[in-house]
Amino acid sequence: MLDPSEIYDVDPAVAAEVEARSAGGAGPVLVHAVRGFVDAGGAGRLAAEHLTEQLSTSRLVTFDVDQLLDYRSRRPTVTFDSTRWIDYEEPELAVDLVRDTSGVPFLLLHGVEPDVQWERFAAAVRQIVERFDVPLTVGVHGVPMGIPHTRPLTVTAHANRPELIADYTSWFGSVRVPADAGALLEIRLGESGHDAVGFAVHVPHYLAQSPYPQASITALEHVQRASGLELEVAALTEA
């Protein structure tokens, strides 16, 4: 595997702030919500957008997406304006330093899911986890389910240690499904001794292709429960 540290850049000033806050205590929780294979109702995407729009953020890590994306399978958009091309939608994958409503710092990994070099990407995130003493990584996304929208949304919780989700009900037995980068990340972090949990919000299948804010609200409520962060969920409820 090629050197994982060569696919991302760290802002030294923001890094110094994170390290100063972590000195002598626990580091920041890392929340991840990358846009990838499955995100029914846009649960993870809307959650990430809410956090970056409602809370104070600083860019800590920027990934080199040219090394990680297959542009021909997921083409960015661009506007043709009469006689010229403008507004190229540049894809990004980044980690932001975010402060919750009480000023508690945490990290947010968001943007596009890598198409290639998953192992290198997972190793890069592990380096970030270890550098900044991250005690817990929490992932969120949505999955389509045969449920009505008139009932409260439920989640499937998963973790690399069963103690992390002891209070949750298991909805499934063993099932083989296509992987995503978040699943690999959870596995690799566990193999390295780092705690990671995730929440897949059950979204009514007929709403899976449309933005469904209630799914992101549910996702963030479970992130709060797992991490103790205060994430301004009420603002999303009112939107």
Put a short name on every predicted segment.
Residues 40-44, 48, 114, 118, ...:
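Generic structural signal for well-ordered, non-membrane alpha-helical segments
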Residues 1-111:
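N-terminal short beta-loop-beta anion/metal-coordinating cradle
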Residues 146-226, 230:
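Catalytic cores of processing enzymes, dominated by hydrolases/peptidases
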Residues 60-62, 229-239:
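Flexible, glycine/charged-enriched surface loops at secondary-structure junctions
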